[in-house]
Amino acid sequence: MIGAAAVAHAPNDGYSLLFTAGGPITIGPNLSKHPSYDASTSFAPIALIGQVPSFLVVNANNPAKTLAELVDAARARRGALKYASPGVGTSVHLMAELFRLESTIEVIHVPYRGGGPAMNDLLGGQVDYMIENAPQLLPQILSGSLRALAVTSSRRLSSAPDVPTFAESGVPGLEVGTWFGLLGPSDLPPDAINVLLQAVKQELQNAATKKRLEDMEVQIDFRSSQDVAAFIEQDSARWKDTILRAHIEPE
């Protein structure tokens, strides 16, 4: 959020730009009592580049073979199941809270300092499930040490075609991903925005760039300035609502 704040208050010369994931823009301000910038007014959206989906995974020894079975287990053992996250307020923590709310289950959140320790405890059976970005989980999924029950994208991933979406699994509303975009200061001139937009568009048409992004499980989702502004507003509203419903206190 420090970098985002710096760009929000930077000169509009086109040299101070923010390449960012969605968290600092649409989650961070909603978790702060005194945010230093506003997602809707502090930036000039330039381009959305893509989104990285996330998996909900369980230990391979977990009896749940489907998302429905995990939900049934959570309802049968109300308040007993535990889920891990890389920390309070991370995008995947809020995805897990959104899953909890949409599936009407009661579970215990166990926050860690990073995804590595969280995954280690999931592998060790200390927690029951977690949601994490696809690139971090795919090696364990493909090796069989973790079982993916659902993916947050609108369609199945080619790298894990047997894993259904949340909607296919009976839990709609989880079509969310970690998005990446390019932003500038709010008063960045339109001609500068257009030059940068065209440069991003051209690069995303490069075959090598596309392959590199696909190898990192980035689903290219190119959108121009006005579309990005609407997307950011919608994304911010979703996480604000999730934070309120989950009773997560801003700090």
Listing of model-derived features with the role each one plays in the protein:
Residues F19-T20, P86, V151:
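Short glycine/serine/threonine-enriched helix-capping/active-site loop
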Residues M1-T41, A80-K82, T104-N133, Q140, ...:
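N-terminal (or domain-start) structured segment
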Residues Q51, L137-Q205, Q234-A237:
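C-terminal lobe and pocket-closing loops
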